[in-house]
Amino acid sequence: MAIERTLSIIKPDAVAKNVIGQIYARFEAAGLKIVAAKMVHLSRGEAEQFYAVHKERPFFKDLVDFMVSGPVMIQALEGEGAIAKNRDLMGATDPKKADKGTIRADFADSIDANAVHGSDAAETAAVEIAFFFPGMNVYTR
């Protein structure tokens, strides 16, 4: 399996619960390296631009409202099969359907406040990482 990078966002609900460290520990235990990280409070424009792919979906406004409701922790993760590994760690989008021991099962409250975002493919990972971390801010280690 190849070394990949993926984008991860710890959403406002999980930041408010003070579980960033617990989530980071799961990334690292799974062999993922955090190669870039920052805490930000997204502007409405940033959230709308980042989630533009969902603009026509009925949940778009609620998603944007949620993502600007508090600070988020954004990180680029790197490792063998990082995209699939992170998605396995996150669990199903709906925490009620997420496997026990996944981030969403343990820390999320609802399908809307579902604790984390992760890139779904190599192409989206590249776009999402570039959105938040221009090349000079990502460090291979």
From Swiss-Prot:
Predominant subcellular localization, coarse grouping: cytoplasm
Keyword terms, alphabetized: ATP-binding, Cytoplasm, Kinase, Magnesium, Metal-binding, Nucleotide metabolism, Nucleotide-binding, Phosphoprotein, Transferase
Gene3D superfamilies: Nucleoside diphosphate kinase-like domain
Keyword Cell division carried by entry: no
Record InterPro entries: NDK-like_dom (IPR034907), NDK-like_dom_sf (IPR036850), Nucleoside_diP_kinase (IPR001564)
Sequence positions that bind ATP: 11, 59, 87, 93, 104, 114
Enzyme class: transferase
Annotated catalytic residues: 117
Cofactor: Mg(2+)
UniProt-recorded Gene Ontology molecular function terms: ATP binding; metal ion binding; nucleoside diphosphate kinase activity
EC number: 2.7.4.6
Entry keyword annotation includes Zinc: no
Catalyzed chemical reaction(s): a 2'-deoxyribonucleoside 5'-diphosphate + ATP = a 2'-deoxyribonucleoside 5'-triphosphate + ADP; a ribonucleoside 5'-diphosphate + ATP = a ribonucleoside 5'-triphosphate + ADP
Location of the protein in the cell: Cytoplasm
Record-level GO BP terms: CTP biosynthetic process; GTP biosynthetic process; UTP biosynthetic process
One GO CC term, this protein: cytoplasm
Task of the protein: Major role in the synthesis of nucleoside triphosphates other than ATP. The ATP gamma phosphate is transferred to the NDP beta phosphate via a ping-pong mechanism, using a phosphorylated active-site intermediate.
NCBIfam families per UniProt: PRK00668.1
Similarity annotation: Belongs to the NDK family.
Subunit note: Homotetramer.
Name of the protein: Nucleoside diphosphate kinase
Organism field: Cupriavidus pinatubonensis (strain JMP 134 / LMG 1197)
Origin organism lineage: Bacteria, Pseudomonadati, Pseudomonadota, Betaproteobacteria, Burkholderiales
